[in-house]
């Protein structure tokens, strides 16, 4: 026991074992006491900062987790934890100021990473529990932090270090192990060093064992070695299935060795002769198990009454057997019945009893057995008589059943007939033999009662054999039917499996088709969506274009209105050519009179202006010619003159804009304002034109021809002042014009003639003087 204590002490603190050989329960320091106690509990001491940095750790961490203290100091605790537990542990460690009393004690469980994992293996973790308290380095300096700092630094820390840096988490880390024994006995060294020990009251029992402290774990373990023979016996007892079992019973009685065959359970009881059943209801199999006569039967005295009764019963059975030819007894079988009987059986009863006494010593057990067997024999006599009749009835019933089976088999195919036909021949031969046997039995003398008993027993056995032979073809036929049914069932199962496979394949094909249809529908939907989006985009573009066009139109409308107003307000300037001189005439364009600008010339008289003449839609006569100004130009000015008054042609200048030229005024051409007078009637017929020409023929002066631009051309001037060029033909032409002189070209219709109200230049006085009487 002392050696085991030394081994444990070596594991706990190797340094102390070198100094002291005897273990003394004394602790030099508080840290040492904590280290020893924690090592017994599979734990170690740790010191953490408020940030989770490991400040100090005990040396026994290397034996528990495989980390060296120098390597682990300075690391953060969160680096040794799995990723799933980092947030939870950080919330536990962090301190919130001001601290409450309940927050100074912290407990939590987590998993720490092991350090002695082999290269290439995955990281292993140990389930540990932290039990730490918040400590102030200044208040508990000599007790807790004596190994970290010197004593003279206590005052300096209290003065200069803030409160957050003075607080540390000091406590213990215990490893929670659940399967320690399994780890101990996996190694060979541990299994070889198993020692039978017994725990004493002096040493406490440690419940939790560490895998690293192997010998300390053996103090509480007991290795028990069992002999192979005892183990085999125990295994035999625990096993429920035993093929052969040898059972012996010790005592004054006889030793009986039995071999019991069993599939599931075995019987371990001894069989005694006095345990025979006493009830008369015995089955047929009990008698078939005794082919020979027991010698005890020969010792009983012969009863004359029994023999006489037995003879009478045999005489009665004789005629019954003759009527029933199916009694399965042959003369050879009868001769065989008497063969096993020795001549010694006919010895007197006294000699038989004397010979039985040395074999069976005088004891109460032997007498009881003999008396019980005698009673059984009496009861067997009665049962044999009854069962002979029952057997005859059973044989008849079986024959009827066989006939039905034959009828049924004849309907079946011929392949099955060879199984039944030999049995029929044997069954037909049996009744003939039975008839001969019964006839011989009646003629013979009455046999001995013992022979009668043997005869009855063998007749029963032979009848049972015959019934068994008759049942064999039925069993064979039933077996064939069962085989056929099994084959049919197998075929049905195979067909069902094939159908299931086909259904599965069809389902797979249907699923694939459905998936393809779904994909097609999705593609169609996507295409329709794209088309709708394109249509919407086009509609949006069209709407935007319409809006832009409307905006432009709205912007152009006020500009056009302004241009029209400017054109109406500006005075009309005309360039008039009189002879070879050009005269610019400025005509005021009042707002109340609309003067349209057309591509048709307007004639002015030198003395008096005339009303504009509308052209008739008739063909030009041959007596007149058409004078064209600039025949190849786009805007052609047309004038009609009579041939009589036609003078030499005048070279007319092209119609150009002379807005930059200086204004020239002439007194020979009076300027008349344009006034609107509704009293002037329009000339609708050629006669009106002739009449007007005749009235004005006396005062006919030089004709003034005015060329104007069209309305479209005026719109392109963009606000420039409009001028009318007026050309005056030669003066001095006399003679009234022909009535057809005012006939316009055929291209102009009467409805297109313009009113003379637009270019009235005649003053009111001249108009009154020229009116016809």
Curated annotation (Swiss-Prot):
Gene3D superfamilies: PAS domain. GO terms for molecular function: DNA-binding transcription factor binding; transcription regulator inhibitor activity. The keyword ATP-binding does not apply. GO terms for cellular component: CLOCK-BMAL transcription complex; Cry-Per complex; nuclear speck; nucleus. GO terms for biological process: circadian regulation of gene expression; negative regulation of circadian rhythm; negative regulation of DNA-templated transcription; regulation of transcription by RNA polymerase II. Residues 313-361, 427-448, 506-569, 732-773 are annotated as: Disordered. Changing residue 36 to E: Reduces inhibition of CLOCK-BMAL1 heterodimer activity. Residues 365-412 are annotated as: Necessary for transcriptional repression. Testis-specific. Expressed in a broad range of cancer cells, including melanoma, lung cancer, and breast cancer (at protein level). Testis-specific. Found in histologically normal tissues from patients with uterus, lung and small intestine cancers. Widespread expression seen in solid tumors and diffuse large B-cell lymphoma (DLBCL)-derived cell lines. Isoform 2 is expressed in all DLBCL-derived cell lines, while isoform 1 is preferentially expressed in cell lines derived from non-germinal center DLBCL. SMART domains: PAS. It comes from the Eukaryota. Transmembrane segments: none annotated. PROSITE patterns: PAS. Keywords: Biological rhythms, Coiled coil, Nucleus. Residues 506-536 have a biased composition (Basic and acidic residues). C-termini of isoform 1 and isoform 2 are sufficient to interact with and to repress the activity of CLOCK-BMAL1. Functions as a suppressor of the biological clock that drives the daily circadian rhythms of cells throughout the body. Acts as a nuclear repressor of the CLOCK-BMAL1 heterodimer-mediated transcriptional activation of the core clock components. Inhibits circadian clock function in cancer cells, when overexpressed. Interacts with the CLOCK-BMAL1 heterodimer; this interaction inhibits CLOCK-BMAL1 transcriptional activation and suppress circadian timekeeping. Interacts with BMAL1. This is Circadian clock protein PASD1. It comes from Homo sapiens (Human).
